Amino acid sequence: MSDSPATAHTRLELPIDIIKIQALLPHRYPFLLVDRILELDQKQKRIVAQKNVSINEPFFQGHFPEHPVMPGVLIIEALAQAGGVMTQLDLSHNGHSSLLFYMVRVDNARFNKQVVPGDILILDMTMKRRIRNMGCYYGEARVNGEVVACADIMCAGVRS
């Protein structure tokens, strides 16, 4: 196991695969939008995740059949899910937290470029603060190093 800054606090081997992600998030197909965790630094409250965008995504059937584009709201949801993985790891005992997090607010959302089939979406989330059961994050989604979307996201945790 590596002792890099990304794993020293969590003692998790990176990358974190879909099996571990499914143990941390309640989302399932077709709404699980995080495929892999590439970086995790719980001391800095930062996570970097990956979403492989495939033409087989069900939303491409209607958005748009002749010009498939990933809906911006799903990019924001993917960012929130990445933040959810980080928060669950931070709060969990034996890999599971008793809180279920819901997105309750999105501010300053910007969409700079379309995300299309074949893109690898890199989701970079930083927790700005946590107040009791609320988490405030800033996230950027990138394709080929270029920011395609960003937003401030607030999530609230409730007992599951």
UniProtKB/Swiss-Prot annotation:
It holds the Pfam family FabA. It catalyses: a (3R)-hydroxyacyl-[ACP] = a (2E)-enoyl-[ACP] + H2O. Its main location: cytoplasm. GO terms for cellular component: cytoplasm; membrane. It is found in: Cytoplasm. GO terms for molecular function: (3R)-hydroxyacyl-[acyl-carrier-protein] dehydratase activity. Its EC number is 4.2.1.59. InterPro entries: FabA_FabZ, FabZ, HotDog_dom_sf. The active site is at H63. The keyword Heme does not apply. One of its GO terms (biological process) is fatty acid biosynthetic process. Keywords: Cytoplasm, Lipid A biosynthesis, Lipid biosynthesis, Lipid metabolism, Lyase. Coiled coil: none annotated. Involved in unsaturated fatty acids biosynthesis. Catalyzes the dehydration of short chain beta-hydroxyacyl-ACPs and long chain saturated and unsaturated beta-hydroxyacyl-ACPs. Belongs to the thioester dehydratase family. FabZ subfamily. This is 3-hydroxyacyl-[acyl-carrier-protein] dehydratase FabZ. It comes from Xylella fastidiosa (strain M12). The gene is fabZ.
